[in-house]
């Protein structure tokens, strides 16, 4: 998993944090 992902739309995919992911 990821550490905490910051940002209003941040999410974790696999083991990488992304700034934005669609709902």
Curated annotation (Swiss-Prot):
Disulphide bonds in the chain: 2-12, 5-17, 11-21
Tissue specificity of this protein: Expressed by the venom duct.
Annotated domain remarks: The presence of a 'disulfide through disulfide knot' structurally defines this protein as a knottin. The cysteine framework is VI/VII (C-C-CC-C-C).
Any single GO CC term annotated in Swiss-Prot or TrEMBL for this entry: extracellular region
Protein location: Secreted
Main location: secreted
Keywords tagged on the record: Disulfide bond, Knottin, Neurotoxin, Secreted, Toxin
MF terms (GO), sorted A to Z: toxin activity
Source taxon at top rank: Eukaryota
Name listed for the protein in its UniProt record: Conotoxin Cl6c
Zinc among keywords: no
Keyword Secreted: yes
